[in-house]
């Protein structure tokens, strides 16, 4: 089973450690943590951990900035993960597929050490000859190691690395002139030429066109959804936003934002959530007053499993013959 996950920074600023890597996330950042990566965080922000059996994302850990416009869309995705959905939504997985790739690290040790230095400080202006002298090899040898191992010459690799870092900075609303300086280009025109060569567009078009790690565009609307579930232990359902209807044998309740409904163990439950609405399962015994995403995330850290098992609709008809017809939810 894949234990890779997505970490959504819903608010504040959080430092997330993945092994030897540290990522500083701000509200609107989404981080991919690959399989086998253990994570911890410090800071005052709120991280929502999205666990799916199927992510459709691979490669190293990486961060993209979606912005606050994606906040409710990602809370919806968090809700899907808590309900036990198998796979992350395709549009979310595609965000990582579209990103500007980091140039590969060279395998030979001298070139690899140089590449790691440049990755840590893209603005480093050390020349190929100076790096070669530091490593005790010829400039020709170092150049050959870059070309044979990555397909890039030394200068091309450095430019590709700078462009990759620049896309992340542009996504965090730094100006093009500031970004050019931060990643080591002498002028914005140099950054523009590198952008055209490596990703086929200009920095200004990148920040307005929804390409890769730039602006992610407008998220898809949250659809209505019907979930058929069997509760293995007592559970509650909290309406984060919008409306929903919970139907169990002999019982039907219409819920609005902030409401909480109890789903007893052994109950077969139909949950109809209106378009634009989000319902989140929470452990039993938590009151409606003061419920928040922060509280949900804390509780789920302590008790990851919700105790809800999804049931196929065809099997549901057999399990819950006595269900009342569900009242159609009304969008707010």
UniProtKB/Swiss-Prot annotation:
The keyword Cell cycle does not apply. Pfam families: HTH_18 (PF12833). Disulfide bonds: none annotated. Induction: Repressed by DtxR under iron excess. SUPFAM superfamilies: Homeodomain-like. Residues 112-209 form the HTH araC/xylS-type domain. Coiled coil: none annotated. GO terms for molecular function: DNA-binding transcription factor activity; sequence-specific DNA binding. InterPro entries: Homeodomain-like_sf, HTH_AraC, HTH_AraC-typ_CS. Residues 129-150, 176-199 bind DNA. Keywords: DNA-binding, Repressor, Transcription, Transcription regulation. Signal peptide: none annotated. GO terms for biological process: regulation of DNA-templated transcription. Under iron limitation, represses the acn (aconitase), catA (catechol 1,2 dioxygenase), leuCD (isopropylmalate dehydratase), narKGHJI (nitrite/nitrate transporter and nitrate reductase), sdhCAB (succinate dehydrogenase), pta (phosphotransacetylase) and katA (catalase) genes. PANTHER family: HTH-TYPE TRANSCRIPTIONAL REGULATOR NIMR (PTHR11019:SF199). This is HTH-type transcriptional regulator RipA. It comes from Corynebacterium efficiens (strain DSM 44549 / YS-314 / AJ 12310 / JCM 11189 / NBRC 100395).
């Amino acid at each position: 089973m894949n234990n890779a996950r997505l970490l959504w920074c819903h608010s504040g600023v959080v430092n997330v450690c993945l092994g030897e890597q540290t990522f500083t996330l701000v509200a609107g950042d989404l981080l991919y943590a690959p399989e086998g990566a253990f994570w911890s965080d410090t800071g005052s922000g709120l991280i929502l951990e999205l666990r799916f059996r199927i992510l459709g994302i691979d490669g190293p850990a990486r961060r993209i900035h979606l912005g606050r416009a994606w906040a409710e869309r990602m809370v919806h995705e968090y809700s899907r993960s808590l309900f036990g959905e198998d796979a992350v939504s395709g549009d979310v997985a595609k965000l990582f597929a579209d990103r500007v790739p980091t140039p590969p690290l060279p395998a030979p040790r001298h070139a690899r050490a140089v590449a790691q230095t440049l990755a840590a400080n893209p603005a480093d202006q050390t020349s190929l000859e100076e790096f070669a002298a530091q490593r005790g090899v010829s400039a020709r040898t170092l150049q050959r190691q870059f070309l044979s191992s990555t397909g890039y010459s030394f200068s091309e690799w450095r430019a590709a690395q700078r462009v990759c870092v620049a896309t992340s900075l542009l996504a965090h609303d730094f100006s093009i002139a500031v970004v050019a300086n931060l990643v080591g280009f002498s002028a914005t025109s140099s950054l523009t030429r590198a952008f055209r060569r490596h990703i086929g567009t200009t920095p200004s078009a990148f920040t307005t066109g929804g390409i890769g790690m730039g602006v992610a565009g407008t998220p898809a609307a949250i659809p209505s959804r019907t979930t058929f579930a069997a509760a293995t232990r007592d559970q509650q359902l909290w309406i984060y936003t919008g409306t929903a209807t919970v139907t169990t044998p002999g019982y039907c309740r219409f819920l609005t934002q902030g409401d909480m409904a109890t789903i007893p163990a052994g109950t077969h439950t139909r949950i109809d959530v209106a378009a634009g609405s989000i319902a989140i399962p929470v452990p039993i015994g938590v009151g409606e007053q003061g419920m928040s995403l922060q509280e949900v995330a804390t509780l789920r850290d302590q008790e990851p499993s919700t105790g809800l098992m999804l049931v196929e609709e065809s099997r549901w008809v057999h399990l819950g013959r006595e269900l009342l017809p569900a009242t159609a939810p009304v969008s707010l």
